[in-house]
A protein has these predicted regions:
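Pyridoxal 5′-phosphate
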Residues: 1-484
Length: 484
């Protein structure tokens, strides 16, 4: 079936027609920061894609629990029992948020990166992994750590339909008797098995574009493969339902979901998780440990999520994720999506009025996206531009390659050997460099912060920076020894 905008995750008519909600209260909303030109201004946090501030409700819930903190699954006292119940109730809340199916497991980790490395660690030997080169490094790199895994890197698609077609062709070529030409592979010495895994993002951390997750999942399953969804950028903006999207696993981070307290999630099918050795060995992952007659040790590992949660768990981080899941659900994703789309259109319309600005995209300027846009400005070093937004306007954005080097190189038309490094300026202020600027926003972003950003871009392009800048320790910073 052809891929359309309506087939992308949660890109529904109801999101367009829903009532627009007010920004959700977030911690630090009224923080003032100094300007290099003098005075202070309310900080405009427009780097939500990197890490989101805590929802005020999440902070309040965590603060209310903190005096009652106790060890989880490790104590008979009241606070330990309360904390254990809170931890497991949080697991159930996350399962509801993700639409987990009967038999699915919710494993708590440190982050999306940790979740995908966990999945890589439990893959059956000789599994073939298919991943688009457009992925964040958290999705792109973990599979290479297994010498017995073969990885197929798929070229960047230019339309959602091309993404599905590319995946279907690659999966068909792995089947017995088929050729396997046209794709770059690693681990060529690995044996072949029937197991295959597709790893795909739900929303790009560079362009914000929504990927055709349902169609990719259908293609994977039609060819006997499984699929994991990197929802780090999707879950904070759109509902994620394992059953509805028909994905096998989903991974995301609390710090992207307005719960920045050091926890993440891997949720989905239990069989590979139960069959593999624990991701970490230690207390809590085992049911019994006994010495053998020969002097060794026999271990009976848990078959629940605890198998991969060795060590004292981060109950505050887990509770924060559950609180964020509940807060977003109660706020209503339809109204949250509707408001965010208004902000997206506001930024796109404003940047379109600046000829020097080029917004980066894979699927086209009108592709559905979450509140993430990356762009370059003709005649500007992106690091210099981002530094000026911060120092002169109190606006926090990100510059660099966004831990998605192959994708940004593709979008900028640069070869794989072109110099460039994530997050660091590659030239002096005013020189061109292989990096871009990213602006991102979400449930807590007020309209006036977006409007200030658009005005600042226009002023910088028209009038230039009002201050001098220099490179220091890999960062572009105001030169306080000289006025601009």
């Amino acid at each position: 079936m052809p891929v359309s905008a309506a087939a992308t995750p949660a890109a529904t008519d109801s999101a367009t027609d829903a009532a627009v909600c007010a920004p959700l209260p977030v911690l630090g909303r009224d923080v003032l920061v100094p300007l290099v030109t003098g005075g202070e201004v309310e900080y405009a946090a427009l780097d939500i894609a990197a890490s989101a501030p805590a929802l005020q409700r999440v902070w309040d819930d965590v603060a209310a629990y903190a005096p009652y903190y106790g060890s989880v699954h490790r104590g008979a006292g009241y606070l330990s029992q309360l904390s254990t119940d809170l931890f497991e109730n949080s697991r159930a809340e996350v399962a509801r948020f993700l639409g987990c199916r009967e038999g699915d497991q919710v494993v708590f980790t440190r982050s999306t990166t940790d979740s995908l490395n966990l999945l890589a660690a439990v893959l059956p030997a000789h599994t073939r992994v298919f991943v688009f080169e457009t992925e964040h490094h958290a999705s792109l790199l973990p599979w290479e750590q297994r010498a017995d895994i073969e990885v197929t890197y798929l070229d960047a698609p230019r339309t959602p339909q091309q993404a599905v077609d590319t995946l279907e062709r690659a999966l068909a070529e792995r089947e017995p008797g088929s050729a396997s030409e046209g794709f770059e592979k690693s681990g060529g010495g690995a044996q072949r098995s029937g197991n295959a895994l597709v790893c795909v993002t739900g929303a790009s951390n560079v362009t914000g574009e929504l990927w055709p997750v349902r169609e990719l999942a259908a293609a994977a399953h039609a060819h006997g493969a499984r699929i994991v969804l990197d929802a780090a950028q999707l879950a904070p903006h759109h509902p994620v339902d394992l059953a509805e999207l028909d994905v096998d696993w989903v991974a995301f981070s609390g710090h992207k979901l307005y719960a920045p307290f050091g926890a993440g999630v891997l949720a989905g099918r239990a069989d590979w998780l139960q069959a593999a050795e624990p991701y970490l060995a230690g207390g809590g992952a085992s049911r019994t440990v006994a010495r053998r007659v020969d002097g060794g040790v026999d271990v009976d590992w848990h078959t629940t999520a605890a198998r991969h949660e060795a060590g004292s768990p981060n109950v505050i981080g887990v509770y924060a994720i559950a609180a964020a899941c509940k807060a977003l659900t109660e706020a209503g994703f339809e109204s949250l999506v509707a408001r965010e789309q208004q902000l997206v259109e506001r930024v796109r319309a404003g940047l379109a009025e600046v000829p020097e600005v080029t917004v980066l995209s894979l699927f086209g300027d009108d592709a559905p996206r979450v509140g993430v846009l990356s762009f370059v400005v003709a005649g500007w070093n992106s690091s210099h531009f981002a530094a000026a937004l911060s120092a002169e306007y109190g606006i926090g954005v990100r510059d660099g390659l966004f831990c998605a080097h192959p994708l940004v190189r593709t979008l900028l038309g640069a070869g794989s050997q072109a110099p460039g490094e994530c997050g660091a300026p590659e030239g002096a202020p005013g020189e061109q460099s292989l990096n871009a600027i990213r602006v991102s926003f979400g449930a807590g972003t007020p309209d006036e912060h977006v409007d200030r950003f658009v005005r600042a871009v226009k002023e910088l392009v028209t009038d230039g920076a009002r201050w001098s800048y220099r490179t220091e320790d890999g960062r572009c910073v105001p030169d306080t020894a000289a006025a601009g």
